[in-house]
Amino acid sequence: ELARVFSSPDVKTERSIRFALWNNEETGLNGARAYVDQRQSLQGIENPKGSGKYPEPKWLGMIQHDMMMWDHGMPNADGSIPKDQRPEADVNIEFQMKSKATLASQQLAWFLHGSNEKYATDYPAQVGPHMTNTDSAPFQDLIPTVSLRENERGSQVGAGWDPNWHQVSDVFSTYSDKDFRLGLNAAQTTLGALLHLANGSLKKP
């Protein structure tokens, strides 16, 4: 939906925004790693020369949306999963504190946090330094990089908070209206941030 918004003819930005869908995340971030390996050296190269076209723009930052809708809390003592969204549900914004671009990534994370406070209608955001095991990782040493998700990837998803992670249950019918609204708030957070970062504006009719 964000791609649809930014591709509208009445939306103008001073910087390019590229939306990418990665495959094979489960088997080792293969799609994202291949993109970095194959495209990193092509940044900012005009092709064909004199055309004014740059098939691979210079990378300024990477904002990843991972699993975005299930925040029901930790498993119960018997191992069962809470049916309903937890009252403390929030949008997690993670950067990797051990990356070569950690300072710029942290700045980007807090910029998104500010966007959440301004534009998200229902759910707050939390910033954390442990981005891991996600398609933004291949970019983390190159450019400011963050990952938005429903739970902290390491301590919460890794502890079984999301029963739909890499499972066949990750389908539309699994999620409630509240779950979808959490995902919407992540989209609102990123939409607002991108609009400012790319100096976006609406063209007057």
Please annotate each region the language model reported:
Residues 1, 5, 107-115, 138, ...:
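Amphipathic alpha-helical segments that form well-ordered structural scaffolds
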Residues 1-30, 190:
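Alpha-helical metal-binding/catalytic segments enriched in His/Glu/Asp
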Residues 6, 10, 39, 43, ...:
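A generic secondary-structure signal for well-formed alpha-helical elements
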Residues 8-13, 118-123, 196-205:
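Surface-exposed helix-capping loop/turn segments at secondary-structure junctions
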Residues 11-15, 28, 54-57, 138-142:
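Extracellular/periplasmic catalytic domains that process cell-envelope and extracellular macromolecules
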Residues 20, 61-63, 144-148:
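Hydrophobic/aromatic beta-strand patches that form the interior of the parallel beta-sheet core
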Residues 22-135:
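Metal-dependent peptidase/peptidase-like ectodomains
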Residues 73-89, 94, 126-205:
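Active-site-adjacent mobile loop/cap segments within catalytic or ligand-binding domains
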